[in-house]
Amino acid sequence: MYKSLFLCLKIFAVLILIGCSVTAYIIYHYSHDLPDYSQLARYYPPSVTRIYSRDGKLIEEYAFERRVFVPINNVPSSLIESFIAAEDKNFYTHPGIDLLGIVRAAFLNISNYLHNRRMEGASTITQQVVKNFLLTNEVSLERKIKEVIISYMISRIFTKHQILELYLNQTFFGRGAYGVAAAAQNYFNKSVEELTIAESAFIAALPKAPSELNPDKNYSRVKARRDYVIERMFEDGYITRDTMKEAIGSPIVLRKRAKEETVTADYYAEQVREEVIRMLNSKEEFYRGGLTIITSLDAKMQQLAENSLRKGLREFDRKSGFRKPIANIPLDNWQEELKKLPTPSSLLEYKLAVVLDVSDNHAKIGLIDGSKAKIPIVEMQWARSNLKSVKTLLKKGDVIVVEPIKDCYALRQIPEVNGAIMVMNPHTGQVLASVGGYDFSTSKFDRVTQALRQPGSLSKTFVYLAALENGVKPNQIFNDGPIEIIQGPGMPSWCPKNYEGQFLGDMTMRTGFEKSRNLITVRVATAVGLTKIVDIIKRFGINNEPKKVYSMVLGSIETTLSRITNAYAIIANGGKKVEPHFVELIQDRNGKIIYRRDNRECFSCNIADSDLDTAILEIPKEDIYRVTDEASNYQITSFLTGAIDSGTGYAARKLGKIIAGKTGTSNDSKDTWFIGFTPKIVVGSYVGYDTPKELGKKATGSNVVLPIFIDFMNHAYKDEPSLPFKVPDSIKLIAVDRITGKMIPNGTVIEAFKVNNIQMLENDYMIDNHDIFDYVPGMLDQSQEIY
């Protein structure tokens, strides 16, 4: 008996010795080419770069992996306990590998296999860290052995808290979220500190199968997994029975980021992305660096600008009438047939519908959700002139675009025309809003910064400014009659015409500008000379190399909305150089400022993620560089206010504000423009086809683009005071006759003359600048200041 027992012990000892030897050999063999796990001590995870508006609203997030790093000390214990209960019960006691857990899982999986249940894993949190950071997902014995060896080694080097920090920040949780902080934001719009027990358990349940555990698609499975984690938390002593019951009883309610916390500005965000990548000279740093970027964007103005542009494009498009239905489908199974159709691009808030029946007075429609509604004929009148019956416009089975309005629907169509709008602070250059097109998802081409177009009459402003700079007086008479320009050897003569083909005879330079008379502009240009006009076009940044031909004075040069709006911003600020900019401040992931546009000391500029409502200073920098003298600049500003008061921008008078502005229409009405400004804001807008073609025989900046400006200003500035433009000391205001330009006691227009060239004028009719404000809008006494 003793011999048998002794023999058994010997065999057992030999087996142990062999096992130890084999284990030692395996460890020795696989320890030579292990990855360098010391890199874990230098963990520097790629993080999300966020772009914010000036008032702290999130514009966009960029990342290769959407991750928000959170130090382990900031992770609440309830969230940590959820993961321990779900993934690794013995995490705090085992040396990186859980031998008891492996044995337990082996026996449990035999039972699970026999009963067709899900197999249990035995990987510890430490092993998952090793797999995520240092090894591949290859299924092999060699990889598993290396995983075990490294797990044991790093458990001897790193603390449990360090290992947890790596795990909680690196793990993928679905919906593009890496790390618990990103998961909390993605699923619940909360920080990790705000999560409830039930929400913590939900997040802890995700790593097993993040792509499959989607509450929207498989709610019962997701809830069962979450409830399992909650039960484990109770069994492990982390929560009480009452807490467990309450948590299990709570539904899974996912929350998106609140609308008031964000602002849609796709074109703006793309401009910022490109600009910051250029500044950093690194796409990698932009997408991985966890930057916080504060922009100049004003969330309210951005939304209003987008709304006004879309409204204007839609209204102009409807003037051409209804083109045709998208398709025609059989009505036997209309809902399914409607679902099969590809969703039209740029549908936005519009809906797809099918005509189920038509009568003289309305169309009955079906929507993709199966609901039915009506379109009254009054909501189709735009589609065809003198529409008497819906039957002449639509038929059964027609697929159309509709817009929900009060108590019914309206017939709509997606505009083919496109456009852009840009809003600037003329003193600082801050781009407060920028919308580069009708819909970014359809076309990422930015018509603010990328579209080169002919500005038409917008360029006239700078022809007249060149004349004023060179001493031409605003009341000088020019003839609005036929003219032939001899352009030189080998060049054909040029015979420009007015827009409507008429001639109005003699008029002052001011009147010629206000009425946007082409022939007056050409005569002013001949008086000044093309060299000076080319110089001013370059000086104002409209075009760096304009072709020196006379047609340029009527807008044949090419420019972008950004460039021409900035040129008008220079006029609006009194003639000082300014450049449009989108980015105010950039911080790295640690809050260190790596770029600030305004380098003056600012005690409120260290903005952390939790403190983004801090405002950026708006105090304008004084710039010693003057683009034009203040007297000439004021004179052209006076002309531009006149263009609103009695010229082509007359419709803007309904705003009841002091506004300066100019319309623009290129040859054949292919491009239409309007740029308007007050002492505080400049708004530039443009409408045209991406492939240039005529907008219509009667399409002009006045009737196509000016309504967009008016709609924007009516909403953005309706409560703002009407501020006049400051009259410089170098200007004297004199009453003159609008028609003859001569000084008369009760002149019909108050003209701005330079002090140094009015000696020959009769002093009897000079008006003290301080006395003029009782009856002349748009003028500001020198004693007043504009901020």
From Swiss-Prot:
Region named Transpeptidase: 398-711
Cytoplasmic side: 1-6
GO biological process, one term: response to antibiotic
Pfam families from the UniProt entry: PCB_OB, Transgly, Transpeptidase
Record-annotated membrane-spanning stretches: 7-27
Chain intervals for the UniProt region annotation (Transglycosylase): 49-220
Periplasmic face residues: 28-787
Compartments it resides in: Cell inner membrane
Active-site residues, Swiss-Prot/TrEMBL: E87 (proton donor), S457 (acyl-ester intermediate)
InterPro entries cross-referenced by the UniProt entry: Beta-lactam/transpept-like (IPR012338), Glyco_trans_51 (IPR001264), Glycosyltr_51/Transpeptidase (IPR050396), Lysozyme-like_dom_sf (IPR023346), PBP_transglycosylase (IPR036950), PCB_OB (IPR031376), PCN-bd_Tpept (IPR001460)
Pathway: Cell wall biogenesis; peptidoglycan biosynthesis
Keyword annotations from UniProtKB, A to Z: Antibiotic resistance, Carboxypeptidase, Cell inner membrane, Cell membrane, Cell shape, Cell wall biogenesis/degradation, Glycosyltransferase, Hydrolase, Membrane, Multifunctional enzyme, Peptidoglycan synthesis, Protease, Signal-anchor, Transferase, Transmembrane, Transmembrane helix
Substrates-to-products reaction catalysed: [GlcNAc-(1->4)-Mur2Ac(oyl-L-Ala-gamma-D-Glu-L-Lys-D-Ala-D-Ala)](n)-di-trans,octa-cis-undecaprenyl diphosphate + beta-D-GlcNAc-(1->4)-Mur2Ac(oyl-L-Ala-gamma-D-Glu-L-Lys-D-Ala-D-Ala)-di-trans,octa-cis-undecaprenyl diphosphate = [GlcNAc-(1->4)-Mur2Ac(oyl-L-Ala-gamma-D-Glu-L-Lys-D-Ala-D-Ala)](n+1)-di-trans,octa-cis-undecaprenyl diphosphate + di-trans,octa-cis-undecaprenyl diphosphate + H(+); Preferential cleavage: (Ac)2-L-Lys-D-Ala-|-D-Ala. Also transpeptidation of peptidyl-alanyl moieties that are N-acyl substituents of D-alanine
SUPFAM superfamilies xrefs: beta-lactamase/transpeptidase-like (SSF56601), Lysozyme-like (SSF53955)
GO terms under cellular component: outer membrane-bounded periplasmic space; plasma membrane
Membrane topology: Single-pass type II membrane protein
Molecular function GO labels: penicillin binding; peptidoglycan glycosyltransferase activity; serine-type D-Ala-D-Ala carboxypeptidase activity
Keyword field contains DNA repair: no
Location, primary (coarse class): membrane
Membership in a protein family: In the N-terminal section; belongs to the glycosyltransferase 51 family. In the C-terminal section; belongs to the transpeptidase family.
NCBIfam families on file: PBP_1a_fam (TIGR02074)
Function: Cell wall formation. Synthesis of cross-linked peptidoglycan from the lipid intermediates. The enzyme has a penicillin-insensitive transglycosylase N-terminal domain (formation of linear glycan strands) and a penicillin-sensitive transpeptidase C-terminal domain (cross-linking of the peptide subunits).
Protein's UniProt name: Penicillin-binding protein 1A
Gene name of the encoded protein: mrcA
